[in-house]
Structure formats: structure tokens, C-alpha cells
């Protein structure tokens, strides 16, 4: 057993008391991102090592692996703690998203180590989708690169409010304050173009040597800020979903016998209470919450993030993908939306193509009506394009086969985030973030929609023998 963990359990008075203490710690989900070979995996290995989260047998195995696959000469290659795939170890790079867990006395952490190569940008977007904070690594020798900008923009797009810019490998530039200041200024110039307000912090460090990771560096007396670990332990995270209205996407209908019908899922935002009047969309039918059932027993109130089963007072028709919300809220269904898309397939995305869409447990189809623009990652400018290439990011108009109830992604990542699936191969080819639901075209003053008027004009022009009258009252 890890000696530090054993000591913590002993101090808490046993395993059960230690587990209770762990449950009451706050949880921070963060990812490491940046360009290839910036030291992301090494940084995570250093965090695990310096917080004493490595078991003795893991440390022994790491020594042996460092001799066979290591890239640091005689030194311990901490990146091997995270790079688990054989291909990753052979190439000395990260390919898949690797998740690691560790804790300190102040907080629990889940880390997503994401790949830096451009062809694995889709993996990075996957890792970032559930995180509250992003550590953006920059090699002190190279400065701000294209992937630095790309990952910054994707993190911002996915609603991550906290960015920690870790300027790594300071030992290779002589721990130069001038180098740190120059990179900091370059990044702030770029970050000024990112949408929204961001909490951006800068930490100069050496993941290989441990400077300013968990302990203050003696080699950089000019830096008097917190270490990286101190930033992670103290940053205040405010979850948007806690302050948003109730959203409960139905994941499945739970009907174990004739006496019970419940609607299971995870509460995406807000809270729900027993007795609360709720509305089912898209049908609009209303009812009251009779019970809130969980594995550990019934609740009187549930909050965002909890997996629950709702039992309603009335027997009404509810299916997987329906959305439950407070009865007093009016959320119209829409059939089109402007969606920010991160494209993940070799075949480009073009207007006119159709795909399967999954959003909040519901599966439907959508057609690409138009690509409004693609974002140039280097300067965040928008340019008109005919198609969106692999790893391209752009704003796309989608029309769905049926009306959907949507929030914007910034309001609610669950009801505003979708995945795009190829209908033939069933492969996920894109990630979408709803920027703006587009409401149906309003009826004209005549009472007819634009579509009906256009169809009427077409029939009268090409089929006059049908004798169709002009809906606007003309001849």
C-alpha cells in the first residue's frame, strides 16, 4: 500500500472514516493540453509523484520502464505513469485521453491528459468536455504555438472559465524571467481575442525537476506567486448548472412491474422537489412529482448531477429523450439551430449532408443547411468556406427532422451539447455546441407561412390548370 495513504487512513481512524472524509472534499476536474512534447504527461506524473500518490510497486515498475522506454536518460521518466498504450510509449507521445485520480488534504482531482498532436485534436475536445479548468502547457523554448491557440480556443468554446498557463521546461532556458515575461505577454495578446471573460493565471515551472509544481522553486526567486498545486487546491469553481433552471432529460423509462413507472436519468441542472409541478416537452403535458427514487432511498429534493428516478402523480406518455422542466417555464421547441462544430472526420463536412444527432439522450437526424464560417485558429478570424476539414472549427446551421428543446451550450452543456454520427458507419464524426436555437419562421400577416406562400406561387405558375387561388388575394 502507498505509505502516505496508509498514514492518512490511520490519522482518520480507519478506512470508513477516511472514505467519509473523502466524500466531503470538493472535486476539481481539469485537463492538461498544449502542443506536442510540451511535457503534459510528465507534469501529471510529477503531480502524482510529489503528492505521494504512487504505490511502491508502481514506482519500481516505473524505474524498469524508464530504462526500456524512457526519454529522460538516467532520470525517472514520469510521463510513463500516464502514457499507457504501447504505441504511446514507443513514440514517446500521448494518443488517447488518459484519466488519473489523486487527492490532497484540501481537494480531490480528476485529470484528463490529452494529446498534443494536431491529428488528435478530437481526443482533446473529448477530454475537455467535462472539465472545469485547463492547464495549458507551453514549452519555454518554443513559446506560443498553433496548437496552444487551438487548445485555448476549444477550451473556451467548451465553457472552461479557468485557464492556467504553465510555462514548462524553464530549466532549459536558465530559469529566465525575461523568457517567462515575453511568453506571458504573447499569450495575453492572443487571449484578448477569446470570447467571454476568463480567469487566466501563469506559473513558470519545470515538470521534470519539480520546480513550482508542488513545491516552490529555489531557482526562480523572481517568481513569488503560488505553485501549480496551490492554484489547483484554491481555485473557486462555480458550476453553471447549479444556477440554471431545472432540466431533466429522460434516459430511460423504468418499468420493473405493473405497480411502478419511473423516469430515470441525471438531473442536468437546477433542482427538483417532491410535489413540484413539472412539464414534459415536447408534448407540453403537466404533472406533479410524486417520488424521487435513488439507489440509497427516496429524496425530498435532488440537485444537478444526481442520478435519480422521478415518479409522477399521473400516468402520462413519456419516452427516452423527452425533457422534464418546471411547469412555469416556457421553452419553445425549435427545428433549426446555429451550432459550433468541432469536426473529427477525414471526410469534410459540407452543406446538404445528413447525419444522426444525439443530444441529452435523444437521437434524431439533422441536415447541414449551411456553413456560416470557419475559425482561423491563428488569429481567431472568421472566413467563408465550402466545407469544414478534419479538426476544423466552424459555425454551422443544422435543421432537425423533428422539433427539439434546446438550450445554448453556455447555459447548459447537457441540453446544449450534441454529437454528430455518420449514418452508415455509426462513427462519431463531430461535436456540436448549440450557440443559438433558431425559432420557426413566423407566419405572415396573411396567416400563411413563407413556405405555404412559395408553394402556392409555384403551383399557380407551373400548374395553372389546377385552378389554385392566390393565398394573398390576388388573381
From Swiss-Prot:
Q: Which part of the chain is the tr-type G domain?
A: 25-239
List the keywords (alphabetical).
ATP-binding, GTP-binding, Nucleotide-binding, Nucleotidyltransferase, Transferase
Chain positions covered by the region annotation G5: 206-208
Signal peptide interval: none
Annotated region (G3) at 113-116
Q: Which domain of life is it from?
A: Bacteria
Which family does the record assign?
Belongs to the TRAFAC class translation factor GTPase superfamily. Classic translation factor GTPase family. CysN/NodQ subfamily.
Q: How does it assemble?
A: Heterodimer composed of CysD, the smaller subunit, and CysN.
Put simply, this protein is called Sulfate adenylyltransferase subunit 1
Amino acid at each position: 500500500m502507498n505509505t502516505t495513504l496508509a498514514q492518512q487512513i490511520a490519522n482518520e481512524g480507519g478506512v470508513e472514516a477516511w472514505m467519509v472524509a473523502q466524500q466531503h472534499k470538493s472535486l476539481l476536474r481539469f485537463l492538461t493540453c498544449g502542443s506536442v512534447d510540451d511535457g503534459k504527461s510528465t507534469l501529471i506524473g510529477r503531480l502524482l509523484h510529489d503528492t505521494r500518490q504512487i504505490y511502491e510497486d508502481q514506482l519500481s515498475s516505473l524505474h524498469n520502464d524508464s530504462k526500456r522506454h524512457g526519454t529522460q536518460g538516467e532520470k525517472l521518466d514520469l510521463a510513463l505513469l500516464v502514457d499507457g498504450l504501447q504505441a504511446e510509449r514507443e513514440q514517446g507521445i500521448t494518443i488517447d485521453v488518459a484519466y488519473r485520480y489523486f487527492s490532497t488534504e484540501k481537494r480531490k482531482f480528476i485529470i484528463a491528459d490529452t494529446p498534443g498532436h494536431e491529428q488528435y485534436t478530437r481526443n482533446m475536445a473529448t477530454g475537455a468536455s467535462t472539465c472545469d479548468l485547463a492547464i495549458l502547457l507551453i514549452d519555454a523554448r518554443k513559446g506560443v504555438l498553433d496548437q496552444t491557440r487551438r487548445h485555448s480556443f476549444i477550451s473556451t468554446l467548451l465553457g472552461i472559465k479557468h485557464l492556467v498557463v504553465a510555462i514548462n521546461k524553464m530549466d532549459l532556458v536558465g530559469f529566465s524571467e525575461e523568457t517567462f515575461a515575453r511568453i506571458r505577454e504573447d499569450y495575453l495578446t492572443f487571449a484578448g481575442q477569446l470570447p467571454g471573460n476568463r480567469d487566466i493565471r501563469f506559473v513558470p515551472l519545470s515538470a521534470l525537476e519539480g520546480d513550482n509544481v508542488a513545491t516552490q522553486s529555489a531557482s526562480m526567486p523572481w517568481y513569488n506567486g503560488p505553485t501549480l498545486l496551490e492554484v489547483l487546491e484554491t481555485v473557486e469553481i462555480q458550476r453553471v448548472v447549479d444556477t440554471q433552471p431545472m432540466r431533466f432529460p429522460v434516459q430511460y423509462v423504468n418499468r420493473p412491474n405493473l405497480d411502478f413507472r419511473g423516469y430515470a436519468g441525471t438531473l442536468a441542472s437546477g433542482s427538483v422537489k417532491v410535489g413540484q409541478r413539472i412539464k414534459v416537452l415536447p408534448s407540453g403535458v403537466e404533472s406533479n412529482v410524486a417520488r424521487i427514487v435513488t439507489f440509497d432511498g427516496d429524496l425530498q429534493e435532488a440537485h444537478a448531477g444526481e442520478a435519480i428516478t422521478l415518479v409522477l402523480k399521473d400516468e402520462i406518455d413519456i419516452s427516452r429523450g423527452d425533457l422534464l422542466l418546471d411547469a412555469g417555464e416556457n421553452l419553445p421547441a425549435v427545428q433549426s439551430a446555429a451550432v459550433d462544430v468541432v469536426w473529427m472526420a477525414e471526410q469534410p463536412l459540407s452543406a446538404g449532408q445528413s447525419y444522426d444527432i444525439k443530444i441529452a439522450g435523444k437521437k434524431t437526424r439533422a441536415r447541414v443547411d449551411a456553413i456560416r464560417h470557419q475559425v482561423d485558429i491563428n488569429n481567431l478570424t472568421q472566413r467563408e468556406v465550402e466545407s469544414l476539414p478534419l479538426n476544423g472549427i466552424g459555425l454551422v446551421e443544422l435543421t432537425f427532422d423533428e422539433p427539439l428543446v434546446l438550450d445554448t451550450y453556455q447555459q447548459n452543456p447537457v441540453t446544449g451539447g450534441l454529437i454528430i454520427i455518420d449514418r452508415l458507419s455509426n462513427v462519431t464524426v463531430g461535436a456540436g455546441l448549440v450557440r443559438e436555437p433558431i425559432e420557426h419562421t413566423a407566419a405572415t400577416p396573411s396567416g400563411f407561412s413563407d413556405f405555404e406562400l412559395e408553394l402556392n406561387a409555384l403551383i399557380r405558375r407551373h400548374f395553372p390548370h389546377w385552378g389554385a387561388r392566390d393565398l394573398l388575394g390576388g388573381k
